[in-house]
């Protein structure tokens, strides 16, 4: 269960994170939900690409100081509608993979899960310490075309990010 989080009408949401030990490595699988606003859908239909970053941090919990960040990485997705092909294209900017879909829900479905994402080796963790995995889906408003950016910062229909969600790492 997450330690924090909430959902907005238009936003991404971290639904579930599962961290397991496979061999000597901890791996993460996660599920997300994307709720696009009408304005975001309209912009995409007009050829505007939308970008999300799935941010993952592994934190060592400390009582006295701020938590120590051991891992800080992101997976970046770009989704764009191609009117001539009547298709949605999702590109994983992190590895260059490109996928085409006939529906928006199918395209968002690809971005809605991560499987077997390597986090850290078991021998890099101190057994008596506590660790948290922090996950967030961030919509990149700075990647929007310049005329849309000011609107995206004041219009709630462009607040398409999730909050940070914390999950304990069970050793």
Protein language model features and the residues they cover:
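N-terminal signal peptide c-region/cleavage motif recognized by signal peptidases
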Residues: 2-4
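N-terminal onset of structured domains
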Residues: 7-50, 61
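Short structured motifs
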Residues: 12-18, 38, 74-76, 116-121
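A short, structured loop/turn motif at beta-sheet edges
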Residues: 19-26, 82-85, 123-133
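A beta-strand/beta-hairpin structural motif
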Residues: 28-32, 83, 89, 93-95, ...
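Structured domain cores in non-transmembrane regions
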Residues: 40-104
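Glycine-rich, aromatic-bearing surface loops/beta-hairpins
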Residues: 119-171
């Amino acid at each position: 269960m997450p330690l924090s989080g909430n959902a907005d009408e238009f936003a991404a949401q971290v639904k579930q994170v599962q961290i397991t030990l496979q061999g000597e490595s901890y791996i993460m699988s996660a599920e997300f939900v994307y709720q696009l606003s009408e304005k975001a859908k309209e912009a995409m239909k007009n050829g505007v690409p939308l970008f999300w970053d799935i941010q993952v941090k592994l934190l060592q919990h400390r009582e006295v100081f701020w938590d120590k960040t051991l891992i800080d990485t992101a997976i970046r997705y770009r989704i764009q509608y191609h009117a001539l092909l009547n298709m949605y294209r999702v590109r994983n900017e992190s590895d260059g993979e490109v996928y085409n879909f006939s529906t928006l829900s199918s395209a968002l479905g690809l971005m809605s899960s991560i499987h077997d994402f390597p986090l850290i080796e078991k021998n890099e963790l101190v057994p008596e310490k506590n660790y948290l995995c922090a996950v967030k889906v961030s919509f990149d408003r700075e990647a929007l075309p310049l005329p849309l950016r000011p609107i995206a910062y004041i219009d709630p229909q462009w607040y398409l990010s999730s909050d940070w969600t914390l999950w304990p790492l069970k050793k």
